[in-house]
From Swiss-Prot:
Record field: catalytic activity: UDP-alpha-D-glucose = UDP-alpha-D-galactose
Gene Ontology biological-process annotations: galactose catabolic process via UDP-galactose, Leloir pathway; polysaccharide biosynthetic process
Pathway(s) served: Carbohydrate metabolism; galactose metabolism; Glycan metabolism; exopolysaccharide biosynthesis
Cofactor(s) the record lists: NAD(+)
The protein's Enzyme Commission number: 5.1.3.2
Active site: Y143 (proton acceptor)
Organism: Rhizobium leguminosarum bv. trifolii
Family listed: Belongs to the NAD(P)-dependent epimerase/dehydratase family.
Upper lineage: Bacteria, Pseudomonadati, Pseudomonadota, Alphaproteobacteria, Hyphomicrobiales
Protein known as: UDP-glucose 4-epimerase
InterPro entries membership: NAD(P)-bd_dom, NAD(P)-bd_dom_sf, UDP_G4E
UniProtKB keywords: Carbohydrate metabolism, Exopolysaccharide synthesis, Galactose metabolism, Isomerase, NAD
GO molecular function: UDP-glucose 4-epimerase activity
Keyword NAD: yes
SUPFAM superfamilies linked to this entry: NAD(P)-binding Rossmann-fold domains
């Protein structure tokens, strides 16, 4: 429980760093393990950092022996869907082989509490909305498949081994720490909210909307945006749940509220008071028109209730991106 050391793998990244903040606030000792290929050293502010790669078993063994964590939170992964189609081998090497190496090291060290960052991309194209955890899992790209393979491995580790896990399937993570210490910072950026904010700030030539003829209330895609601090809270609750002996479980993390791209852009204009050019272009292959979570199970199992709405997501993201010293 509180006071325990937690190894946060990928803890220098966007969601991992916000989770370190929440862990520290709740009395845990987060130790970041990161190769800093996508993470940021300046995001490691709430505990020590150990540099290393999840494919390096000897380095993992060394770090686990040194810090003796009670649980592992695993965020480290390649995440860009488009890149996964161009270079699937890297995604399998990092997301599958890397995770299996981490799991082997964890088992050898006697760690049996593991929280895994998964994704709603494991569901593939939704057959019904909102999606609950019983929805079939038929991922449609290599990124989603790598996460699904790890989910299956974790189920086997639970059934035939001694490792219990909480699999957290995120919907659209967004927003930033309200004190502006950390926020979303990807290179290159592909997520809608930072791209639209950059357009409002004049840092890019407007914003492109992929598809305006979907069967949704205004023709644009619907997504479930969840504040990164709500995600962080769910991860800390998942650690507590496992350390108290909870059984392995997979949970959706979303608000249950869908927002269209047009609604999102309108909300960003309202917060920023800066109109920006929007271009409507053709649909993007593989995009689902609606992805919204049923989050009842996370509420039941973890007592988790999202605290922040879309306006708070956008306000915190705006404050972060508008800081002139950011990147």
């Amino acid at each position: 429980m509180a006071g325990e050391t937690v190894l946060v793998v990928g803890g220098a990244g966007y969601i991992g760093s916000h989770t370190c903040l929440d862990l520290a606030n709740k009395g845990y000792r987060p130790v970041v393990f990161d190769n800093f290929s996508n993470g940021h050293r300046e995001f490691v502010r709430w505990g020590p950092a150990e540099e290393g790669d999840i494919r390096d078993r000897a380095r993992l063994d060394e770090v686990l022996a040194k810090h003796k964590p009670a649980a592992i939170l695993h965020f480290a992964a390649l995440i860009e869907v488009g890149e996964s189609v161009k270079d699937p081998v890297s995604f399998y090497e990092n997301n599958v082989i890397g995770t299996l190496t981490l799991l082997s090291a964890a088992q050898a060290a006697g760690i049996n509490a593991f929280v895994f960052s998964s994704t709603c991309a494991t569901y593939g194209l939704p057959q019904s909305v909102p999606l609950d955890e019983t929805h079939r899992q038929v991922p449609i790209n290599p990124y989603g498949r790598t996460k699904y393979i790890v989910e299956q491995a974790l189920a086997d580790y639970d059934q035939y081994g001694s490792l219990r896990s909480v699999v957290l399937r995120y919907f659209n993570a967004a927003g930033a720490d309200f004190e502006g210490r950390i926020g979303e910072w990807h290179q290159p950026e592909t997520h809608a909210i930072p791209l639209a904010i950059d357009a409002a700030l004049g840092r890019r030539q407007g914003f492109k909307v992929f598809g305006s003829d979907y069967e949704t209330r205004d023709g644009t895609c619907v997504r479930d945006y969840i504040h990164v601090l709500d995600l962080a809270d769910a991860h800390v609750r998942a650690v507590e749940y496992l350390l108290k002996g909870g059984d392995s479980v997979a949970l959706n993390l979303g608000t249950g509220t869908g927002t269209t791209v047009k609604e999102l852009l309108g909300a960003i204009e309202e917060v920023s008071n800066r109109p920006f050019p929007v271009e409507y272009i053709g649909r993007r292959e593989g995009d689902s028109h609606t992805l919204v979570a049923n989050n009842d199970k996370a509420r039941d199992v973890l007592g988790w209730v999202p605290q922040y709405d879309l306006s708070e997501i956008i306000r915190s993201a705006w404050d972060w991106h508008a800081k002139s010293n950011q990147h």
